[in-house]
Amino acid sequence: MPGFERSERVRRRVEYQRIYDKGIKVHGPKFTLFRFPNGLAEGRLGIAATRKLGGAVVRNRAKRLIREVFRRNKLAPGFDIVIVPRRELLETSLVALEREFRNTLERSARRTR
């Protein structure tokens, strides 16, 4: 089972800032998604789970769920995606979260056209 490779991550503060400033922002019930073209062949994911979400255990669980959804659904090749989770994300099944991820990504794609 492939993991979450280093090349699939948004890692630098400058990259996050560019995505926040110039990317497309779409709100969903479980998270907010930012999307920006990266010029690469593969998509990259960044997760911004702040202390507002909860303690370390809660934040790590949210990040694990998001990474798993991204790993299973490589739907955005050529884009950097940053997800800011909400508390509601933790009360959702993985299947429902995948559906929400796909829907939010489609909504962001419609906004670029």
Model-derived features with residue positions:
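Positively charged, solvent-exposed patches that mediate nucleic-acid binding
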Residues: 1-113
